[in-house]
Amino acid sequence: MARRQGSDTTPQIAQPGSIGYHEVLQRGYRWKVPSRFNMAEVCMRRWARDVQVSRMPAVLACAPEQEDRSHTYGELFEQACRLSNVLQALGVQRGDRVAIVMPQRFETAVAYMAVLQMGAVGMPLSQLFGPDALEYRLHDSEAVVALCDASTLAAVQSVSASCPDQH
């Protein structure tokens, strides 16, 4: 249990649910992330390298009025590598922010894995944002690229002229 000082300087225990408990826990919390950590390695690449596991489903795509589709770790890895190469050719570098303006689907998983494996930062943006909200977030984040699909292309194109730092 977390401790906090009382008014009489006698240590008191902050009980779960008490006002100071969350604050004490928050102050004491530290992330324990290894100095060299890549989310794409953990979520995709290590599985894709194993011949047997690479053929196993990584993503199950379910959509109304469509047949369910299964995608393997191998497919995810292959497509993510292709997209990473395209992003690199566009000048995206480690630490750059890449906006991902797509609905939840297999291609969105590919986009995140591609961005993460190259050390860039994937920034999710809702496909429901209007032009002002989208433009503000692209500017404020200093995103260098916005990835979109057919459903969000018009919205991204409508603000692209005002985002000169994008590739």
Model-derived features with residue positions:
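Structural core segment of the AMP-binding/adenylate-forming
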Residues: 2, 89, 110-113, 117-167
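Active-site diphosphate/adenylate-binding microenvironment
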Residues: 30-38, 104
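Short, contiguous pre-domain boundary segments
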Residues: 21-29
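Conserved AMP-binding/adenylate-forming core of the ANL superfamily
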Residues: 55-113, 130-135
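Short, well-ordered amphipathic alpha-helices
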Residues: 43-45, 84-85, 153-157
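A short N-terminal helical cap/helix-turn-helix that marks the beginning
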Residues: 2-17, 35-59
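Short aromatic/basic micro-patch
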Residues: 38, 70, 147
